[in-house]
């Protein structure tokens, strides 16, 4: 980054992104997690559009649009969950969901909450931002986004799957299907890519699919875990 312009802005937003990431992993309730997710959406947007070229800005705006829409859908799901459970504390939500005889009535709410996390993780069909964003961002930003941004989305998926729908076979099957499609699609896109950074981006998307498959398996295995 020594020869790059806007270095001070870059490092400032890198620290903000790292701080938001720490907030996500240290949060004890879903609403606090959501707040830090949205902070990360805007700080990582600046990292993607660092070069300020036309295609760079368009790619960054695509990412921001997906992130904002995903965040709004997740917020709707959080409101609905709070109305049902009266809390968004993760430990209390786990106890609440385990006390329900029919968790299927919460599937729609779970999908809404998952939507924003899936957008961050780059899951199909919300992956449209990922290849271009990784390609146009500076190499240090691409590395940061690859190791942090998508993994926070995976962390959100783990929260929904293991806190709300632990050992739920139907939910696990749904997550498993998303993981398989993401894994295969990412690999296919990587094979046909002619840009090295885009190839690595699509490969990262495929690897996310592998992780999501593992999350889905905990539901399918059920009480055998």
Indicate residue ranges for each PLM-predicted region.
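Alpha-helical transmembrane segments of multi-pass membrane proteins
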Residues: 12-15
């Amino acid at each position: 980054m020594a020869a790059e312009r806007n270095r001070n802005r870059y490092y400032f937003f890198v620290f903000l992104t790292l701080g938001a990431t720490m907030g996500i992993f240290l949060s004890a309730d879903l609403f606090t997690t959501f707040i830090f997710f949205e902070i990360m959406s805007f700080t990582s947007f600046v990292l993607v559009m660092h070069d300020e070229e036309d295609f760079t800005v368009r790619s960054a705006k695509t990412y921001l649009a997906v992130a904002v829409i995903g965040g709004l859908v997740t917020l709707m799901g959080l409101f609905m969950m709070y109305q049902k459970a009266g809390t968004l504390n993760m430990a209390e939500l786990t106890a609440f969901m385990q006390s329900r005889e029919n968790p299927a009535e919460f599937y729609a709410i779970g999908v809404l909450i998952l939507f924003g996390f899936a957008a961050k993780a780059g899951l199909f069909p919300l992956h449209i931002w990922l290849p271009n964003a990784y390609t146009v961002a500076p190499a240090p930003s691409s590395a940061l986004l690859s190791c942090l941004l998508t993994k926070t989305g995976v962390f959100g998926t783990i929260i929904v799957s293991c806190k709300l729908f632990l050992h739920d076979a139907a939910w696990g099957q749904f997550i498993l299907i998303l993981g398989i499609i993401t894994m295969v699609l990412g690999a296919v896109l990587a094979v046909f890519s002619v840009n090295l950074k885009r190839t690595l981006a699509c490969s990262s998307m495929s690897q996310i699919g592998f992780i999501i498959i593992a999350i889905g398996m905990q539901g399918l295995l059920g009480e055998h875990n």
